[in-house]
Regions:
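Short acidic catalytic loops
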Residues: 11-19, 45-48
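Glycine-rich, charge-decorated loop segments at or immediately adjacent to ligand/cofactor-binding or catalytic sites
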Residues: 45-68
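Conserved functional hotspot residues or short segments at active or partner-binding sites
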Residues: 166, 171-276, 296
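Conserved anion/nucleotide-ligand pocket segment
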Residues: 67-148
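Glycine-rich, aromatic-lined ligand/substrate-binding cores of catalytic
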Residues: 108-111, 119-200
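A short helix->loop->beta-strand "cap" motif at the edges of active sites that frequently abuts
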Residues: 39-43
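Glycine-rich oxoanion-binding loops at beta->alpha junctions
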Residues: 1-8
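Glycine/threonine-rich flexible loop motifs
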Residues: 18-30
């Protein structure tokens, strides 16, 4: 918000449902609102809401020195497991405000922040938002799969935008091993879906989600779908001439840096990167602990 938009206000209320993923831009909007309120000496009240992916923490950290953008403002993992209220207090407490779209936050800037907590929620509880957080996350399954599939947005693969069930299936034209087929079509939720009007072959990810939950491994970010589609694309005739990651800058912004993209393009294993993310995750878990407001149920 601009200074003119805030000029006649006494207080700003922020009440938005997020899904626990760094690149979900409601978080970036919150940071910008905090900075604007700080600049205008306006108090901000965040009406906190549960995180439907509160159990999930992992993935690459954001390198704010190189890829800070509207799909990534804060130096946190791709999936952070926190509520917006907790993250607002963390941004204040860690001096992450004041950078806007630059790569140099100003620790001196503080927002006059009040967080009204939600009640009756524990971090690893199964919880679904009463309304869809956004048009392309229309179901609880789509919300749960979003962290694992969002990086595909910067690739040639479709995540089902332009269909009735986005973020539950993946594919692209010419995926010969794909057991399902779908054709993205412009609709109210996606006016310009990838591969619009072209039949895409691929597979449903719903069964994967059920398997991860049954195995108790759904608390870590999964890159297996990204890997499988990358390998499948490279084995198509189009893959000889066209990169799988067709929007490299956007991919880096989503993933938090260039390391993952470079490893995929070089067809290297991801074990070293995942080990690095594991160490970063441990440090983040310790850092965030002082800002957590909600229990973790046994």
């Amino acid at each position: 918000p601009t200074a003119a938009q805030l000029a006649d206000l006494d207080v700003v209320l922020f009440d938005v449902q997020a899904v626990g993923v760094r690149c979900y831009t409601f978080l970036s909007t919150l940071v910008l609102v905090m900075e604007a309120c700080a600049e205008q000496s306006l108090p901000l009240i965040v009406l906190d809401r549960p995180n439907p992916n509160g159990h999930l923490v992992g993935g690459p950290m954001l390198d704010t020195a190189s890829v800070r953008s509207f799909v990534g403002f804060l130096p946190i993992p791709l999936s952070h497991g926190m509520t917006l209220g907790e993250l607002a207090e963390m941004a204040n407490g860690e001096g992450w405000l004041g950078g806007g779209y630059s790569t140099s936050p100003n620790p001196a800037i503080q927002c006059d922040l009040t967080v009204i907590p939600c009640t009756g929620w524990s971090r690893n509880a199964q919880w679904s938002a009463p309304i869809a957080p956004s048009p392309n996350l229309p179901t609880p399954a789509a919300v749960q799969l979003y962290p694992h599939l969002v990086l595909l947005e910067a690739t040639t693969a479709s995540v089902g935008r332009g269909t009735a069930t986005p973020f539950t299936k993946v594919g692209f034209p010419g995926f010969v091993r794909g057991p399902i087929s779908f054709t993205p079509t412009p609709n109210a939720a996606s006016r310009y879906p990838k591969h619009a009007g072209k039949p895409c072959q691929g597979f449903s990810v719903l069964r994967r989600l059920g398997s991860w939950q049954a195995q108790g491994t759904d608390n870590r970010l999964k890159l297996e779908v990204l890997n499988e589609l990358h390998e499948a694309w490279m084995n198509t005739p189009a893959g000889d001439q066209n990169p799988f990651i067709d929007r490299p800058q956007f991919f880096d912004q989503l993933s938090g840096g260039s390391e993952l993209r470079l490893a995929l393009e070089a067809e290297e294993g991801l074990e070293a990167l995942q080990n690095k993310w594991g160490m970063q995750r441990a440090r983040f878990m310790e850092m965030r602990s002082v800002y957590l407001r909600y229990p973790t149920s046994p």
